[in-house]
Design a protein with these regions (language model features):
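C-terminal closing repeat unit and adjoining cap/tail of repeat-based domains
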Residues: 186-235
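A generic tandem-repeat structural signature
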Residues: 1-28
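Extracytoplasmic beta-rich repeat domains
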Residues: 1, 23-46, 71-95, 119-135, ...
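Short loop/turn segments that connect beta-strands within beta-propeller blades
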Residues: 17-21, 62-66, 113-116, 151-154, ...
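WD40 beta-propeller blade core
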Residues: 14, 59, 110, 148, ...
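Loop/turn-rich, solvent-exposed surfaces of beta-rich toroidal or solenoidal domains
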Residues: 137-152, 156-199
């Protein structure tokens, strides 16, 4: 039977029968007092499901019985302020060719071997959006409004593009919250809470253009067929 996996706000992963809704098993992570709004969906491959919690825990579980294969923690030991101490993994873990890529809010991005749980590389990068893996590169949006291109095998930074922090940069007014990126037709696309979408070259990081939206965008766009869909904050 098929399975549906869901993560609750109190850091539990539940496996349900897709036909009957019967609970098959659950896994409990560490409780966390403070977390960001929203949660990461689990990612599955090769009979395993990788789940992420607001505590910074990243756990690989067997699909059939929920047995833990390995666990890691993406919380940062260097906590500069109260906000940076939130270790939440809100971006969905990505599994590509047997490697798990994940990023936490507190400043740790990792590549982990799915089978063994061993870290392949680690970088001090903080983010709350899902990384996008394409070929030999990974694209990620940071909490500092930067788009980074990293090499898939070593995590080496190839280029960095700074996005605007504020609508009014001179007076630091009206902060912009970005979401994405999504790669489509040789373009990286990000959406902003100020009602603009930006396209960026995946090869150089060069800003290619902007597209007005009906309103702000809070969730990443999706690609279906040859069409890119946005959902704006005014439900258009």
């Amino acid at each position: 039977a098929g399975r549906v996996f869901a993560v609750t706000i109190d850091n539990q992963t539940h496996a349900l029968d897709s036909e009957t809704g019967e609970k098959l098993w659950f896994h409990a992570g560490l409780a966390e007092v403070a977390s960001l709004l929203g949660a990461a969906s689990p990612a599955g491959q090769a009979g395993n499901v990788v789940t992420a919690y607001s505590s910074g825990e990243l756990v690989a579980l067997r699909v059939e019985n929920g047995r833990a294969l390995w666990a890691d923690n993406l919380s940062n030991v260097r906590r500069i302020d109260a906000l940076s101490s939130i270790a939440d993994i809100r971006g969905k873990p990505v599994i590509d060719r047997g490697v798990v890529y994940a990023i936490s809010h507190s400043g740790r991005m990792v590549a982990i071997d799915l089978r063994s749980g061993g870290r392949i590389w680690e970088r001090p990068i903080a983010g709350v959006e899902t990384p996008w893996v394409a070929g030999d590169f990974i694209y990620v949006l940071t909490v500092d409004s930067q788009i980074l291109c990293l090499t898939r095998d070593s995590g080496r930074v190839r280029w960095v593009t700074q996005l605007p922090h504020f609508v009014n940069e001179e007076k630091n007014k009206y902060p912009i919250i970005w979401t994405g990126p999504v790669l489509v037709s040789d373009r990286l696309v990000v959406g902003g809470s100020h009602g603009l979408a930006m396209t960026i070259s995946p090869y150089t990081g060069e800003l290619l253009g902007m597209q007005p939206m009906p309103a702000g965008v809070s969730i990443p766009p999706i690609v279906a067929g040859e069409t890119l869909y946005f959902l704006s904050d005014n439900a258009r």
